[in-house]
Design a protein with these regions (language model features):
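Polyanion-binding surfaces on beta-sheet-dominated domains and ring/shell assemblies
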Residues: 1-273
Length: 273
């Protein structure tokens, strides 16, 4: 008779509960009530969901990171850099390969053939475009970097790609791959219930479905540069400037969270025998 239930995931010894780090709102009004924000999770329009970010969970990978924000949960693993095949022509720069898979239980629609849908391939292409400018490819000639992303729970495509961008960049840094800077992903939406000058940062699936336009961005806050930008729908230039300014401001806080997670993981590795 089995003494343990194999259907349940047994956490390793020394495991600790998740500690969520709240990202403060960038709103100048400190006495505003969250109950009147109008959002389904009571956040203010310019406030993102609290995130949990933990590097180094996949021991077999060169670098990895798990991220959780609301109903969005995913894990990234980096393998490499490693030499390319002998039959491959010489390339003075490294090659980045990105593969995204959705778990069968990641959304309300069951996926019978994981990895074969166009949603995963589109997300992988977007991740590739967002991360490639941040990697110093010239230092890794004739080599390849394999990045694997598994979506455990999805709360909308744009939220997935934003969280995956941040987690993947942390995984690359944890793998020891030289970067120009950490890449942070963010998304925003223009909702009819809010003025155009108050975009909803980090919208949920429900909020995104009711929005007139959707905006996602990947940027390196340390350098103040944008690596990828995607806009769906129509938005006036004034509102677009507001979205860019708020995303840049919030990304600095998220950059601090990612940096702190890497530092804590490095200190933990140094203490291990």
């Amino acid at each position: 008779m089995q003494a343990t239930d194999r259907r349940r995931f047994t956490a390793p010894e020394g495991s600790q509960p998740l500690n969520y780090r709240s990202i403060p709102s960038t709103s100048s009004s400190s006495n505003s009530s969250t109950s009147t924000s109008g959002r389904e999770d009571k956040r203010s329009p310019d406030q993102v969901r609290p995130i949990f970010l933990q590097p180094g969970l996949v021991t077999e990978a060169a670098g990895s990171a798990y991220i959780e924000a609301g109903k969005t949960k995913l894990i990234c693993a980096v393998y490499g850099p490693k030499p390319t095949a002998l039959s491959t022509a010489f390339n003075p720069k490294a090659k980045l390969n990105v593969e995204v898979k959705f778990s069968p239980f990641s959304s309300g629609v069951r996926r019978f053939v994981p990895g074969k849908d166009t949603e995963a391939s589109t997300l992988a292409a977007t991740l590739h475009q967002s991360l490639l400018p941040s990697i110093i490819l010239e230092n890794l000639p004739k080599s390849q970097i394999d990045l694997f992303v598994t979506i455990l729970e999805s709360d909308g495509w744009d939220g997935d790609v934003s969280m995956a961008t941040t987690a993947a960049s942390v995984a690359l840094a944890e793998a020891g791959i030289q970067l120009y800077g950490l890449t942070i992903g963010l998304c925003a939406a223009s909702h009819p219930a809010f003025p155009s000058t108050s975009p909803l940062l980090d919208p949920t699936r429900t909020e995104a479905a009711a929005s007139s336009s959707f905006f996602s961005i990947a940027l390196m806050p340390a350098l103040g540069s944008v690596t990828n930008l995607r806009l769906t729908g129509t938005i006036n230039p004034t509102a677009l400037d507001v979205v860019l300014e708020k995303c840049l401001e919030v990304s600095k806080g998220l950059h601090g969270v990612a940096r702190q997670a890497l530092l804590q993981n490095a200190e933990k590795v140094e203490r291990e025998p």
